[in-house]
């Protein structure tokens, strides 16, 4: 059977395989034809991630099926990103240097570190659990607000791009502000 394998960036190839082939074997073929290293490939069929140790027949992949390839960054690139961020105390020291003399900035930073350590020692497990609960609740509210905001922005773009007729465009802006205000009220 023939499978069409597509990269998100538009490259594609057609591969002849049997249903008895493993996903790992398919990854090798994809690597040869599309020059995507096997360890960077995620293969998807109908939105389902294919496991390397399974066979194509396990996913009921038939002739003329289409497999999507998503490239994940190499693991060493992910490690580089984590090392690029500066520690809090270094960043704070740089900010203090801008506003104080070098000696004063070092003294203030020392006091801040000492106070930070003292407060960490006084924190109870209950207080940490409460803080985590609040942060998770805020994160969920932010995600809900983003989900509500995305369709509103899309509909406003449609109106501004000729979908709304000749209303001058001011009505769309007012509606967006009202939705923002409603979202803020819901957050409180």
Curated annotation (Swiss-Prot):
Domain named Ubiquitin-like: residues: 1-76
Entry keyword annotation includes Cytoplasm: yes
Keywords: Cytoplasm
GO cellular component: cytoplasm
Compartments it resides in: Cytoplasm
The keyword Transferase is annotated on this UniProt entry: no
Tissue and organ distribution: Expressed specifically in post-meiotic male germ cells of the testis. Abundantly expressed in stage 14-16 spermatids.
InterPro entries for the chain: Ubiquitin-like_dom (IPR000626), Ubiquitin-like_domsf (IPR029071), Ubiquitin_dom (IPR019956), Ubl4_C_TUGS (IPR041421), UBL4B (IPR043317)
Disordered as annotated region, ranges: 146-188
Biased composition (Gly residues): 161-174
Miscellaneous notes: May have arisen from retrotransposition of the X-linked Ubl4a gene during mammalian evolution.
Protein name: Ubiquitin-like protein 4B
């Amino acid at each position: 059977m023939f499978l069409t394998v597509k990269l998100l960036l538009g490259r594609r190839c057609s591969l002849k395989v049997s249903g008895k082939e493993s996903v790992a074997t398919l990854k090798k073929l994809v690597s040869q034809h599309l020059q995507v290293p096997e360890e960077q490939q995620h293969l998807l069929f109908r939105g389902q991630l294919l496991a390397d140790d399974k066979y194509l027949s396990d996913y009921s992949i038939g002739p003329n099926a289409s497999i999507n390839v998503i490239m994940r960054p190499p693991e060493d690139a992910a490690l580089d990103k984590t090392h690029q961020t500066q520690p809090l105390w270094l960043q704070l020291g740089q900010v203090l240097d801008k506003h104080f003399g070098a000696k004063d900035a070092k003294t203030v930073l020392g006091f801040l570190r000492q106070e930070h350590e003292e407060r960490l020692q006084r924190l109870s497990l209950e207080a940490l659990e409460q803080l985590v609960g609040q942060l998770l609740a805020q994160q969920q509210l932010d995600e809900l607000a983003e989900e509500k905001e995305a369709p509103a922005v899309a509909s406003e773009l449609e109106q501004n791009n000729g979908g709304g007729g000749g209303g001058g465009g001011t009505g769309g802006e007012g509606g967006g502000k009202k939705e923002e205000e409603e979202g803020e009220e819901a957050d409180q």
